[in-house]
A protein has these predicted regions:
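Conserved inter-motif catalytic segment of the P-loop NTP-binding fold
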Residues: 2-4, 10, 17-19, 23-24, ...
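Conserved RecA-like P-loop NTPase ATPase core
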Residues: 28, 51, 72, 130, ...
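Pre-Walker A (Motif I) flank of P-loop NTPase domains
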Residues: 29-33, 68-69
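Phosphate-binding/switch region of NTP-binding enzymes
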Residues: 34-36, 40, 44-45, 73, ...
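Hydrophobic positions on the alpha1 helix immediately C-terminal to the Walker A/P-loop
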Residues: 46, 50
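Gly/Ala-rich phosphate-binding loop of Rossmann-like dinucleotide-binding domains
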Residues: 55
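Short, conserved catalytic or adaptor-binding loops enriched in Gly and charged residues
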Residues: 87-96, 186-190, 297-298
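DNA transaction DNA-binding modules
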Residues: 225-343
Length: 343
């Protein structure tokens, strides 16, 4: 039996360790990624664009790529169809991009085939398997165990060779506020992946789609893409920080402006809205938002929020942090909230 390999905390704290690398900067890490979307949405077009970029060291949507050999297993296509796509996408292709339209299943030799490929092309950076279902075999095992077992074989291979492997998969036709819950199969798939991508259109006939990205080392991002001339082009990219900022109610931005020339303010929620000349927000909602964003947005803007119950109603206190005079100071010293004296 193999002995457990352990590392003590002191070593982890002080020894420089190699950080995960990205084949596409801040988007596609080394390891296993799931790329999911409905049938005929254009997943293969996007995968081919990605493969072309990495094989030539060209940026993908202004994001640098790590140049190297690329293997694209187009297991639902023919070489003729791949050639037609290349005609439409590029005038110049690299000898570093390799295609195959058939392979073994995971259960009968795919990993061995990939190992042999790497012996011939040791500078490979990316392998795309399109699709997962084409390399799986029917199993009577528990669905979660089957999903986890299959995807773990691919992940172990990717980790062992420090390269990126993208597995193309489908999503279910269902409504869910979390797009990642639409990935076909069990959480054994998404739970094993280092990153998960979901490409989704609001309407099937639309030429625009959203690409949702999440992962262990990949920050949550949303991309708006447009399919034009057989190529997915970037319209807009939003980071997790930008998306979080968009969730902040507009009235709180106006509250920051309201407090810009004040050191403190106190009163009821109704009085606050009247002072700000706000007519579209009700008192209970502004109170909820003040509490929800007090440690994030308000704190970032150096505003201290306090709430108390008085004989004549609920009172709100707003104050600038000590040392913040509106000139962008960054003091962390708080000041006591304004005391409201009941008549």
């Amino acid at each position: 039996m193999q002995k457990l390999q352990t590392v003590n905390a002191e070593t982890l704290l002080y020894e420089p360790l190699e950080k995960p690398s990205f084949v596409v900067d801040s988007l596609i890490p080394t390891g296993l990624s799931l790329f999911c979307g409905s049938q005929k949405i254009g997943k293969s077009w996007l995968m081919l664009k990605l493969c072309l970029c990495v094989s030539q060291g060209l940026p993908l949507w202004d994001m640098p790529t790590m140049e190297g050999d690329v293997l694209y297993l187009c297991l639902e296509d023919t070489f003729c169809r791949i050639q037609d796509r290349l005609f439409r996408l590029t005038n110049e292709a690299s000898r570093r991009l390799h295609f195959a339209v058939a392979s073994c299943k995971l259960s009968d030799g795919l990993i061995v085939q990939l190992e042999d490929y790497l012996k011939d092309y040791p500078n490979s950076r990316l392998i795309v398997i399109d699709t997962l279902q084409k390399v799986r075999t029917a199993s009577k095992d528990n669905a979660y165990a089957s999903d986890y077992g299959d995807i773990s074989l691919i992940k172990d291979f990717a980790d062992r060779h420090s390269l990126a492997v993208i597995v193309v998969h489908h999503i279910r036709k269902q409504n869910d506020s979390d797009v990642f819950n639409k990935v076909s199969g069990t959480t054994g798939l998404t739970g094993s992946a280092d990153a998960t991508f979901v490409l989704e259109k609001e309407k099937r006939a639309s030429d625009t789609a959203k690409l949702y990205v999440t992962g262990r080392d990949t920050p949550y991002q949303e991309f708006t893409l447009r399919f034009r001339d057989c190529s997915w082009e970037l319209v807009e990219r939003k980071t997790q920080e930008q998306l979080a900022k968009e969730m902040i109610p507009d009235v709180l931005f106006r509250l920051v402006d309201f407090m810009r020339d004040k050191e403190e303010w106190a009163g009821t929620a109704t009085e606050l809205l009247a002072a700000m000349r706000e007519t579209e927000t009700i008192p209970t909602v502004i109170t909820k938002w003040l509490n929800e964003y007090r440690t994030t947005f308000l704190n970032e803007n150096h505003i201290v929020y306090q709430y108390s119950r008085k004989k004549h109603g609920r009172q709100i206190s707003l104050a600038k942090r000590a040392g913040d005079s509106g000139d962008g100071g960054d003091s962390d010293i708080g000041i006591p909230p304004v005391t409201v004296i009941d008549a």
